[in-house]
UniProtKB/Swiss-Prot annotation:
Glycosylation sites per record: 264, 372, 518, 571
Binding site for Zn(2+): 334, 338, 344
Active-site residue numbers: 335
E.C. numbers: 3.4.24.-
Subunit structure: Monomer.
Record's subcellular location: Secreted
The protein's name: Zinc metalloproteinase-disintegrin-like HR1b
Residues noted as binding Ca(2+) in the record, renumbered to the chain: 404, 407, 409, 411, 414, 417
Length: 614
């Protein structure tokens, strides 16, 4: 039996809590200083590794003791991992660096079933962990004493006030343009959640802007990428996907394509380059470009949808937008999700009350959870598209092994795997056999509680607005009934708006969303710009032509807001809908925007009663 080294590290909290400090993540308000003290006891005859297979940390967070278990991520690299950069004179330099004894770990908090951790132990402890639903970051402090570490909540990192950042994907239907429309398609049963094992061999390309940003420090760039993939690998475990980094290319001399702010153009160019150049020099399943370019509008990432294994389209582009590694990792995970056939989440998609990773806007803090909808779409993608390239594990690795009950990976023949019996936190699962207990009715869902259906009448989805209707469990299913809402056209918000698909869209809230709390709706004269009929100001686009708004429709075109500094402020994006007045918005007394026209509310909704979102 192979003996595994167990290391215990006691973290002593420094006598004070800091109020503000500048760290790699940015300016941090409220942090704790800790000193890791490593105590190791090697079993007799054990071989010393630079980085142990497993480690355990005991420390306090907010005065409460926690135990953090870490396990080396042995699926992070393929054994034949290689990387390429370019010399100052343009020569290609390709190496196969040793990666077996690396320093990247996944982990969990003892007695917290929903906890996660992604940690680098290369030079101190650096990364993030989720504790009791809150995200914490940890990193070494750059004092003369190298043992000092800062631990702080993600929410305590100061962030610039700006419009929300979002994915640039606007068409997320299947290639046949036939979206999944039935609610039953978005119900993920316990059986469906036992996804088959899949492997994504990932190639990452780093553009020259990032090299410049890090002053040519390739070692620092590598560490940034390795931690990105460590987090991505951890997130995709919930879909039983192993993401292994097989190749890294750093454009240290110059970019190989024209990386530009037009995200659709950059995505197209990168796809062409991947097909014609990259695939010929390194086998892989999916390629992601990481860049410092500021894409047009609020876009921070874009990818082709349902494209995994396609020679050109199995790609994505990601802006290296944040100094927090977790944020960039989540963006790349999101774009890879599109490659796997997962569209953006709609209003009916849930993650147990937490934000979801496939929301079109990145949440704060960023989510590591796939929604019920995402899981159903991924399952459908596997069934309908049958992507062949992700069937096989990365070559020359020991990642593929016979099923092992207790390794927390769902493998062939297992119904569940919650770890060893002493560490299992999942009561539905018999840890000794990796089978579900015979009394289990459900494993997950809004109406599933401790493996049994919730009592009929238990509210499972609260009303989001006065236009929405709360839903309750039936007592016969783990899933919350399909979302329902009040009839479209019903007055709301004291007659400032009319209900539309469960919401009360008004311009004031749309301005708040785009430009922050100081913004309000602009004066009427600003909306007259929509009569111009150019690429910025219009009502509709037909046959590549911008159709100007008629006078009565000007408040159904581009949205104008007054943010004090600019009285006719607007937002432009490649997305035809972004920055436009939302459908269903009140444009005059008794009228709403419908198909970019200001029409009578009764005429707009004459055939509707109660709708359900899908």
């Amino acid at each position: 039996m192979i003996q595994v080294l167990l290391v215990t590290i006691c973290l002593a909290v420094f006598p004070y809590q800091g109020s503000s400090i500048i760290l790699e993540s940015g300016n941090v308000n409220d942090y704790e200083v800790m000193y890791p003290q490593k105590v190791a006891a090697l079993p007799k005859g054990a071989v010393q590794q630079k980085y142990e297979d497993t480690m355990q940390y005991e420390f306090k967070v907010n005065g409460e003791p926690v135990v953090l278990h870490l396990e080396k991520n042995k699926g992070l690299f393929s054994e034949d991992y290689s990387e390429t950069h370019y010399s100052p004179d343009g020569r290609e330099i390709t190496t196969n660096p040793p990666v077996e004894d690396h320093c990247y770990y996944h982990g969990r908090i003892q007695n917290d079933a929903d906890s996660t951790a992604s940690i680098s132990a290369c030079n101190g402890l650096k990364g993030h962990f989720k504790l009791q639903g809150e995200m914490y970051l940890i990193e070494p402090l750059k004092f003369s004493d190298s043992e000092a570490h800062a631990v702080y909540k993600y929410e305590n990192v100061e962030k610039e006030e700006e419009a929300p950042k979002m994915c640039g994907v606007t068409q997320t239907n299947w290639e046949s343009d036939e979206p999944i429309k039935k609610a039953s398609k978005l119900v993920v049963t316990a059986e469906q959640q036992r996804f088959p094992r899949r492997y994504i061999k990932l190639a990452i390309v780093v553009d020259h802007g990032i090299v410049t940003k890090h002053h040519g420090n390739l070692k620092k760039i590598r560490k940034w990428i390795y931690q990105l993939v460590n987090t991505i690998n951890n997130i995709y475990r919930s879909l039983n996907i192993l993401v292994a980094l097989v190749y890294l290319e750093i454009w240290s001399k110059q970019n190989k394509i024209t990386v530009q702010s037009a995200s659709n153009v950059t995505l197209d160019l990168f796809g062409d380059w991947r097909e014609s150049v990259l695939l010929k020099q390194r086998s892989h399943d999916c390629a992601q470009l990481l860049t410092t370019i500021d894409f047009d509008g609020p876009t921070i990432g874009k990818a082709y949808t349902a494209s995994m294994c396609d020679p050109k389209r199995s790609v994505g582009i990601v802006q290296d937008y944040s100094p927090i590694n977790l944020v960039v990792a989540v963006i790349m995970t999101h774009e890879m999700g599109h490659n796997l056939g997962i569209p953006h989440d709609g209003n009916s998609c849930t993650c147990g009350g937490f934000p979801c990773i496939m929301s079109p806007m990145i949440s704060d803090p960023p989510s590591e959870l796939f929604s019920n909808c995402s899981k159903a779409y991924y399952q459908t993608f596997l069934t309908d598209h049958k992507p062949q390239c992700i069937l096989n594990a990365p070559s020359k690795t020991d990642i593929v092994s016979p099923p092992v009950c207790g390794n927390e990976l769902l493998e062939a023949g297992e119904e569940c795997d919650c770890g060893s019996p002493e560490n299992c936190q999942y009561q539905c699962c018999d840890a000794a056999s990796c089978k579900l207990h015979s009394w289990v009715k459900c494993e997950s869902g809004e109406c599933c509680d401790q493996c049994r259906f919730r009592t009929a009448g238990t509210e499972c989805r609260a009303a989001e607005s006065e236009c929405d209707i709360p839903e309750s469990c039936t007592g016969q299913s783990a899933d919350c009934p399909t979302d329902r809402f009040h009839r479209n056209g019903q007055p709301c918000l004291y007659n400032h708006g009319y209900c539309y698909n469960g919401k009360c869209p008004i311009m004031f809230y749309q301005c708040y969303f785009l430009f922050g709390s100081n913004a309000t709706v602009a004066e009427d004269d600003c909306f007259n710009n929509n009569k111009k009929g150019d690429k910025y100001f219009y009502c509709r686009k037909e046959n590549e032509k911008y159709i100007p708004c008629a006078q009565e429709d000007v408040k159904c075109g581009r949205l104008f807001c007054d943010n004090k500094k600019y009285p006719c402020h607007y937002n432009y994006s490649e997305d035809l809908d972004f920055g436009m007045v939302d459908h269903g918005t009140k444009c005059a007394d008794g009228k709403v925007c419908s198909n970019r026209q200001c029409v009578d509310v009764n005429e707009a909704y004459k055939s509707t009663t109660v709708f359900s979102l899908i």
